[in-house]
């Protein structure tokens, strides 16, 4: 175990860097400017009850929206009315925000931070991810490269958040493509760990090759779970609720996942890393976004807006990130860091492209 509680593999690469399960604490900001061991011990402590509440709350919101919308739609259709169209649009948006929340919880599981018991952590994390078509085990491998090589040649996330500011027109085009479902296939390739090429160097990236054999096999096996869930769920819905139920499943689950969810993922990724003030450490290359309750619900569920803190100490579970932010702020560690409001971030992102 590392000091922060993150599991380390025993295998090392040729340059001595550990591989496999490790998510390194990014403390390049200033040597020695770290939290006391006793404080860090409290912050990295896992709570089963708090994770159960987080998972349950997200699932209950989804269930409530789906049931309420289904009742309105079926009632309106039976009465030959079209008023249900005004209910579908906000329902799709709300479901997409909660699909995003499920992903954030699967992200916690990828970091081994959802539940103290490893088997429970991985089982719940895999199921949450599979429900929206993602592989938690594949993402675990891919995401480790993002943490350990932030804005480096091996960072697989640069294609999504790199290169900003690019001007307003560029991002508007991207978001329109997201909302029309034109980019979903790229998202699912990424979360399944598919080979890709670095957008800057053109060098092929095969994230599942850069890990331990056991984790590589787990990632490949997890794809079968994802396929099983994605094929089995609609079959079960048809058997239980008929083709009307299947139509609602497509409308309230598939449509949000391939449209609005894609835009949410892009916006959050850009808030976290777009148009940074520097690239030398997570203090500048990552960003903490200060938001109110509306944006927290829409874009930053489960404290995911505290992104600098997450990069500095990835072993801290989501429900302790606000306290971690307070501890770092009190010690002056975030005084020169990328901590901005949502509006300030988007003024940077929407700035004209930098001249070469």
Question: Where in the sequence are the language-model features?
Answer:
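Histidine-centered catalytic micro-motifs
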Residues: 101-111, 139-151, 268-275, 300-316
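Transmembrane alpha-helical segments that form the membrane-embedded catalytic/substrate-channel core
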Residues: 94-106, 135-139, 183-187, 253-281
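Non-catalytic, topology-defining segments of multipass membrane proteins
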Residues: 1-96, 131-251, 318-356
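Alpha-helical membrane-protein architecture signal
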Residues: 120, 124, 168, 172, ...
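Cytosolic juxtamembrane regulatory segments of multi-pass membrane proteins
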Residues: 127, 210-213, 286-303
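Membrane-cytosol interface motif
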Residues: 118-128, 279-292
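Aspartate-rich (DDxxD/NDxxD/DxxxD) Mg2+/diphosphate-binding motifs
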Residues: 104-124, 151-162
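Active-site-flanking alpha-helical
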Residues: 65, 110, 114-115, 280, ...
């Amino acid at each position: 175990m590392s000091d922060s509680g993150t599991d380390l593999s025993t295998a090392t690469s040729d340059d001595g860097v550990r591989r496999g399960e490790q998510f390194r604490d990014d403390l390049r900001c200033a040597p020695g400017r770290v939290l006391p061991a006793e404080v860090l011990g409290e912050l990295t402590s896992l709570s089963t009850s708090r994770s159960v509440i987080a998972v349950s709350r997200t699932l209950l919101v989804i269930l409530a929206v789906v049931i309420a919308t289904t009742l309105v739609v079926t009632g309106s259709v039976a009465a030959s009315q079209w008023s249900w169209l005004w209910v579908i649009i906000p329902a799709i948006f709300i479901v997409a925000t909660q699909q995003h929340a499920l992903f954030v919880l699967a992200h916690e599981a990828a970091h081994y931070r959802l539940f103290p018991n490893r088997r429970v952590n991985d089982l719940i994390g895999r199921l949450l991810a599979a429900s929206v078509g993602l592989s938690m085990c594949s993402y675990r491998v891919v995401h480790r490269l993002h943490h350990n090589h932030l804005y480096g040649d091996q960072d697989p996330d640069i294609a999504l958040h790199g290169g900003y500011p690019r001007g307003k027109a560029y991002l508007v085009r991207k978001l329109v493509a997201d909302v029309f479902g034109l980019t979903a296939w790229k998202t699912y390739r990424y979360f399944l760990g598919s080979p890709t090429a670095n957008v800057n160097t053109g060098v092929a990236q095969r994230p599942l090759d850069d890990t331990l054999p056991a984790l590589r096999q787990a990632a490949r096996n997890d794809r079968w779970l994802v396929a099983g869930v994605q094929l089995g769920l609609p079959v079960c819905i048809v058997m239980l609720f008929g083709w009307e139920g299947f139509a609602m499943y497509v409308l309230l689950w598939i449509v949000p996942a391939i449209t609005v969810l894609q835009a949410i993922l892009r916006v959050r990724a850009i808030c976290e890393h777009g148009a940074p003030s520097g690239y030398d450490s997570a203090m500048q290359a990552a960003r903490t976004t200060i938001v109110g309750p509306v944006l927290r619900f829409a874009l930053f569920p489960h404290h995911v807006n505290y992104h600098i803190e997450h990069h500095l100490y990835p072993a801290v579970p989501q429900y302790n990130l606000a306290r971690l932010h307070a501890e770092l702020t009190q010690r002056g560690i975030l005084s020169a860091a990328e901590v901005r409001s949502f509006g300030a971030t988007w003024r940077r992102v929407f700035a004209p492209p930098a001249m070469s």
